[in-house]
UniProtKB/Swiss-Prot annotation:
Binding site for ATP: Q87, G105, E106, G107, K108, T109, D512
Residue numbers binding Zn(2+): C895, C897, C906, H907
PROSITE patterns: SECA (PS01312), SECA_MOTOR_DEAD (PS51196)
Task performed by this protein: Part of the Sec protein translocase complex. Interacts with the SecYEG preprotein conducting channel. Has a central role in coupling the hydrolysis of ATP to the transfer of proteins into and across the cell membrane, serving both as a receptor for the preprotein-SecB complex and as an ATP-driven molecular motor driving the stepwise translocation of polypeptide chains across the membrane.
EC number(s) stated in the UniProt entry for this protein: 7.4.2.8
Tagged with keyword Metal-binding: yes
Cofactor note: May bind 1 zinc ion per subunit.
Recorded coiled-coil stretches: none
GO MF annotation, one: metal ion binding
Record-linked SUPFAM superfamilies: Helical scaffold and wing domains of SecA, P-loop containing nucleoside triphosphate hydrolases, Pre-protein crosslinking domain of SecA
Protein known as: Protein translocase subunit SecA
Keyword Coiled coil: no
Organism of origin: Ectopseudomonas mendocina (strain ymp) (Pseudomonas mendocina)
Region (Disordered): 865-892
Length: 911
């Protein structure tokens, strides 16, 4: 009741934030004349002055006004662009670790320079994160002159970059890259075997461009580095042959069965479920195909893998459609990002689903993978000391940003009022009528000389609209995952008079559509443009620009509503940039996925009650409200899914932090001898306790079992029973001490045979290797636990609590296994010394093996050359077997060096 009154009196939280920042803007403006008076050298010198002041104890907040004034003046001199007051507010929002919502065309890239410059002064590095490599390169190269003018260095991280180049990029003051690359480099760093192999410094400050796309749309996609597991391609092919024989079970909402079948499809949750008849039929088919033993159940423990394959095949055939969820290109199944419409090369679906789709499409089935390291964007970006972001649409997701990332959203006022007209949705009964109306709208706008952008939700739809336009002989450009390489070129000219561009979802996001086209792209296309040519191009562009503005600006047509209002707003936001005129309209039908799956029957009944004729559209607020309600419902469900993913991943994340901290400590340590000694004592104590329980009677002792364990696990052959028979005073504690002393002595002997330095290096390598191997297996176990944990709900248990409890027990076991396996390997390591002849022969063998490998690589290169140049086949050298020239010296024989010691105690080294 009082909320609206209070809001009227004091303004909204956002208005108060903007008002507070306007005071700081005045401070920056007051310094403008002072900065104008400085020479280039003096302006550049400000950077060193700020760094010195920071070193003396001043804070970044205290430097803000001056640093922003310097960045603004540098922008004017280098880029010919002056930051507006609202852009200064955007920069302050980013510096404070918040999300700045700025409308399309308000200069987000330029806004970023303010916060990036200020925070780079600390020397701890700033990461600028973009959604794709093209934008990372474009923004880095665009802003590089500004940063370098101010004395800062800029780097770009890209996939498949040489290590030295990548290390230099991370060492720069400002590093540009994609969210994927930053995340994968973090995982790679935590698989490195030395500190020199690591790339990233401490994660200090990140500015995320299109923050909603990265932190929300991609939050459910984990980052995984994996290695190959066993090959099951034949099984996928066999099961793929059986799946088409299954029929879908279709039931109307009233419970009336319209088609008896074997499985049900739930489109809302994107799941497939076999029914009783389906299970029986699948078992019969698998038995007939020889994949399931006679009389065996699909649900017996050792057949669960087979059941997973069946479900993967079912989902591949029912829920994944070519040109919608994926495309087939060069014999590979490449996924499409549902939010951007871009392809995601290299990204694969897990749980055998990708292989099932490959089998369905008849392409080469790639081997399944085993996870080596993984994290989520949610957990990776929360590692930064300070995080901020920019986007055109964040306000609808403000609650999620606050809940999960602790980030507030500030809506930055536009520099000029928005002049775009957003028309009400038009809803048709069928898709055919809807597309006909879209074509009519395109023709009308083209006749007026207005550019048109048609937004579609899938490649399939974009190609269908393209076919309709071809029939009408309307010239147009298609921008989807198949033609992404032409993206920048198509978007650059999408604002020309009468231009028609079809784009899947938000393909082309991050590049502005300039009314009249982009004259800079035309200039760049010329080899050595003269001043006259540039002037002519600008004049022609000015005419086109004016023509489009007078016609009404860019018209955005959306062929359907997306699940998220935010994606719809992004599409609308392509029109009406920087106060330009423009308009937008959504065309819907009752056959659209969102309407069919989520919109209530009330809307459908309401439209039928109106007695709508074919080709008629309804334009009513009630329908628009119902659609928005459906979208909110879907957004809420997606948020719950992301939150649930985070709650589960938080458990794994805590474990990840412990393991990665342990790994980093090991890499930094020069000597892990003390750690190994602690492990040795703990592992030995646990082994002894297993056979001689603490505070137990000698009658309860399993001496034979202890002797066997000591030999198998520690390589110690100790006569414990003999010790006990000979010494009555040997009780539990003294026996433990004596065994430990024997183990330490045996290990020390190895150290005397080899150098202490060599053994320390070996210990470190073994510890890292054991840790990595066991962590990899632990990730796989956690994955299996997570996929089956929901079943605990049937036993009236809380799945989340059960997951936390069991994963903690698994982690405790992992830590014990790391100690146990490390000591086991180190206890069994053999230390030996070769005689000179044997050493020479070994070195020769190694050299020949290396030569053979080089020959193979060279032979491969020759084969390529032969194909191209018709070169003659080269002869392959054969390896000669090494000949021993002296007799081998036994380990217990006198050392040939004449020291008088046994050979094994004199010249020995680690094998």
């Amino acid at each position: 009741m009082f909320a609206p009154l209070l809001k009227k009196l004091f303004g909204s939280k956002n208005e108060r934030e903007v008002k507070r920042m306007l005071k700081a803007v005045q401070s920056v403006n007051a310094l403008e004349e002072q900065m104008i008076a400085l020479s280039d050298e003096q302006l550049r010198g400000k950077t060193e002055e700020f760094k010195a002041r920071l070193a003396k104890g001043e804070t970044l907040d205290q430097l803000l006004a001056e640093a922003f004034a310097v960045a603004r003046e540098a922008g004017k001199r280098v880029m010919g662009m002056r930051h507006f007051d609202v852009q200064l507010i955007g920069g302050m929002t980013l510096h404070e670790g918040k999300i700045a919502e700025m409308r399309t065309g308000e200069g987000k890239t330029l806004v970023g320079t303010l916060a990036v410059y200020l925070n780079a002064l600390s020397g701890k590095g700033v990461h600028v994160v973009t959604v794709n490599e093209y934008l990372a390169r474009r923004d880095a190269n665009w802003m590089r002159p500004l940063y370098e003018f101010l004395g800062l260095t800029v780097g770009i991280v890209t996939p498949f970059q040489p290590p030295e180049e990548k290390r230099a990029a991370y060492a720069a003051d400002i590093t540009y890259g994609t969210n994927n690359e930053f995340g994968f480099d973090y995982l790679r760093d935590n698989m490195a075997f030395s500190l020199e192999d690591k790339f990233q410094r401490e994660l200090n400050f990140a500015v995320i461009d299109e923050v909603d796309s990265i932190l929300i749309d991609e939050a459910r996609t984990p980052l995984i580095i994996s290695g190959q597991a066993e090959d099951s391609s034949k099984l996928y092919t066999e099961i793929n042959r059986l799946i088409p024989r299954l029929k879908q079970h279709i039931e109307e909402e009233e419970g009336v069965v319209t088609q008896e079948g074997h499985y049900k499809v739930d489109e809302k949750s994107r799941q497939v479920e076999l029914n009783e008849a389906g299970h029986q039929y699948v078992e019969e088919m698998l038995t007939a195909a020889g994949l399931l033993a006679e009389g065996e159940s699909l649900y017996s423990a050792h057949n669960l893998g087979l059941l997973t394959h069946v479900y993967a095949g079912l989902r591949a055939h029912t829920l994944f459609n070519r040109n919608v969820e994926y495309i087939v290109q060069n014999g590979q199944v490449i996924l499409i990002d549902e939010h951007t419409g871009r392809t995601m090369p290299g990204r694969r679906l897990s749980e055998g689903l990708h292989q099932a789709i490959e089998a369905k499409e008849g392409v080469n089935i790639q081997a399944e993978s085993q996870t080596l390291a993984s994290t989520t964007f949610q957990n990776y970006f929360r590692l930064y000391n300070k995080l901020s972001g920019m986007t055109g649409t964040a306000d609808t997701e403000a609650f999620e940003f606050r809940q999960i990332y602790g980030l507030d959203v500030v809506v930055i006022p536009t520099n000029k009022p928005i002049a775009r007209k957003d028309f009400n949705d038009l809803v048709y009964l069928t898709q055919e009528e809807k597309y006909q109306a879209i074509i009519t709208d395109i023709k009308d706008c083209q006749a007026q000389g207005r550019p048109i952008l048609v937004g579609t939700a899938s490649i399939e739809t974009s190609e269908y609209v393209s076919q309709l336009l071809q029939k009408e002989k309307i010239e147009h450009k298609v921008l989807n995952a198949k033609y992404h390489d032409k993206e920048a070129e198509i978007i650059a000219q999408a604002g020309r008079p009468g231009a028609v561009t079809i784009a899947t979802n938000m393909a082309g996001r991050g590049t502005d559509i300039l009314l009249g086209g982009n004259w800079e792209v035309e200039v760049a296309a010329l080899e050595n443009p003269t001043d006259e040519q540039i002037a002519q191009i600008k004049t022609e562009w000015q005419k086109r620009h004016q023509q489009v503005i007078e016609a009404g600006g860019l018209h955005v047509i959306a062929s359907e509503r997306h699940e998220s209002r935010r994606i719809d707003n992004q599409l609308r936001g392509r029109a009406g940039r920087q106060g330009d005129p423009g308009s937008s309209r959504f065309y819907l039908s009752l056959e659209d996925n969102l309407m069919r799956i989520f919109a209530s029957d009330r809307v459908k009944n309401f439209m039928k009650a109106l007695g709508m004729q074919s080709g008629e559209a309804i334009e009513h607020r009630m329908v628009t409200n119902a659609i928005e309600k459906a979208q909110r419902k879907v957004e809420g469900r997606n948020f719950d899914m992301r939150k649930q993913l985070l709650e589960f991943d938080d458990v794994a994340n805590e474990q990840r932090k412990v393991i990665y901290h342990m790994r980093n400590s090991l890499l930094a340590a020069e000597n892990v001898g003390d750690t190994i000694a602690e492990f040795r004592e703990e592992v030995l104590t646990a082994a002894i306790n297993g056979h001689i329980p603490p505070q137990s009677m000698p009658e309860q002792w399993d001496v034979a079992g202890l002797e066997s364990t000591l030999q198998s696990d520690f390589g110690l052959k100790l006569p414990i029973q003999q010790w006990l028979d000979e010494d009555d005073k040997l009780y539990e504690e003294t026996l433990r001490e004596r065994i430990l002393a024997e183990l330490v002595a045996a290990y020390n002997e190895k150290e005397t045979q080899a150098s202490a330095e060599a053994l320390r290096t070996f210990e470190k390598q073994i510890l890292l290797r054991v840790l990595d191997d066991l962590w990899k297996d632990h990730l796989s176990t956690m994955d299996h636990l997570r996929h089956g944990i929901h079943l605990r709900g049937y036993a009236q248990k809380n799945p989340k609590q059960e997951y936390k409890r069991e994963s903690f027990a698994l982690f405790q076991e992992l830590l014990e296994s790391i100690k146990r396996d490390t000591i086991r390997v180190l206890s069994h390591v053999q230390v030996r010394r070769e005689d000179p002849a044997e050493e020479e022969a070994r070195l020769r063998r190694e050299a020949e093996a290396l030569a053979e490998r080089m020959q193979f690589q060279h032979a491969e290169a020759s084969a390529l050359a032969a194909e191209q140049d018709g070169a003659e086949e080269g002869a392959v050298a054969t390896a000669t077997a090494p000949v021993r020239s002296e007799n081998k010296v036994g380990r217990n024989e006198p050392c040939p060096c004449g020291s008088g010691k046994k050979y094994k105690h004199c010249h020995g080294q680690i094998n």
